[in-house]
Amino acid sequence: DSHRMSISKFRLHEKINFDPVILPKKTIFQLCSLLEEYDGDVKISNLKSKIKFELNNSILISKLIDGKFPNYVQVIPKNNQKKLEVDLKLFLDSVDRVASVSLDKKDGVKFNLAKDVLNLSVNNTNSGDGKESLNVKFEHDLDISFNSRYLIDVASQLDGEKIEIFFNDTGSPALIKDPSDFDSIYVVMPMKG
């Protein structure tokens, strides 16, 4: 969607010619489900307006979305020099706890950052307030808010022990990385106000 993006690369054993395609979100979820317990090769065939994935005893065929994919590279932040580093599990659990105060997971989690401290807060007039403080590595002062569901979704995808979030300013997208994974990055837009 226009508020978040993930980019993952993986290396192929051999170079192949394959025109870029756009897959429906439902197809991606179905493919991920098939791949969860699978560790073999996947044969991918581009059939004009359809794509076919063959793995073991399963075949998934899907229509493709017409059109050309937007230039996502221009959306990746390039000047985010303010680096936050924190334990992944602590971060994920804290965001989840603070967000649980709100009835609506779309409510913003406010980050109040100072030197080596991240204060997380949610304020919902109907269900109350939630606050937590984490010790982090950070060298700046910054106040910024994010949709809690987006943060939880991204953090849940990471496998390492740490999460790194790179900021520019309050209104610019954040770049999120797992320092142990050089092939994936995540971009999340902050909430306004």
Language-model segment annotations:
Residues 1-7, 14-65, 80-193:
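DNA polymerase processivity clamps
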